[in-house]
Amino acid sequence: MSETKQTVFDRLLQERIVWLGEAIDDKLANEICAKILLLNADDPKEDIFLYINSPGGSITAGMAIYDTMQFVSNDIVTVGIGMAASMGQVLLTSGTQNKRYIMPNARVLLHQPLAGFGGTASDIQTQAKLILDMKYRLSQITASRTGKTVEQIMEDGDRDHWFTAEEALEYGFVDHIRTE
């Protein structure tokens, strides 16, 4: 008789909590997307909680999570804990309006997408255009959720810009600082 060992993350999932606690890559994004879709299938009306403690990561992997968050009918409650940096910031900010939280000691990082690429001059030109397009799209998403302009988001994110919980609330990344 084989016994299945339940992990703490399985237990959290039973409570409709999805934990994003590392750098975002394709494997993690697939797991997060699958969990959100599973919770949506279980109950398309009950809130889904996405806790974020992430340094960011792959933009395309993060956009898969973002698109899944927008696709499901559930409200997505986001909670920033520790840090929500880069793509983690985009996901934190993309939670359902008025259901975006940050813990009092968490930090948020807004910055430009990072890229490392090589190849022929034509390849580099193509990749540079792609990352500039991604920068603009991420700025559009953040602007639509914060009430800022795309231009303001792009200017503020031109260099690493760290926010305290209070500053993140004031900027519009989140709606509430969670103290309890």
UniProtKB/Swiss-Prot annotation:
Localization per record: Cytoplasm
Domain of life of the native organism: Bacteria
Transmembrane segments: none
Enzyme Commission number, as recorded: 3.4.21.92
UniProt cross-references to InterPro entries, sorted A to Z: ClpP, ClpP/crotonase-like_dom_sf, ClpP/TepA, ClpP_His_AS
GO biological process: protein quality control for misfolded or incompletely synthesized proteins
GO cellular component: cytoplasm; endopeptidase Clp complex
Pfam families (UniProt xref): CLP_protease
Keyword Hydrolase appears in the UniProt entry: yes
NCBIfam families found in the cross-reference section: PRK00277.1, PRK12553.1
Subunit structure: Fourteen ClpP subunits assemble into 2 heptameric rings which stack back to back to give a disk-like structure with a central cavity, resembling the structure of eukaryotic proteasomes.
Function: Cleaves peptides in various proteins in a process that requires ATP hydrolysis. Has a chymotrypsin-like activity. Plays a major role in the degradation of misfolded proteins.
Homology family: Belongs to the peptidase S14 family.
Protein name: ATP-dependent Clp protease proteolytic subunit 2
Organism classification: Bacteria, Bacillati, Actinomycetota, Actinomycetes, Micrococcales
Gene: clpP2
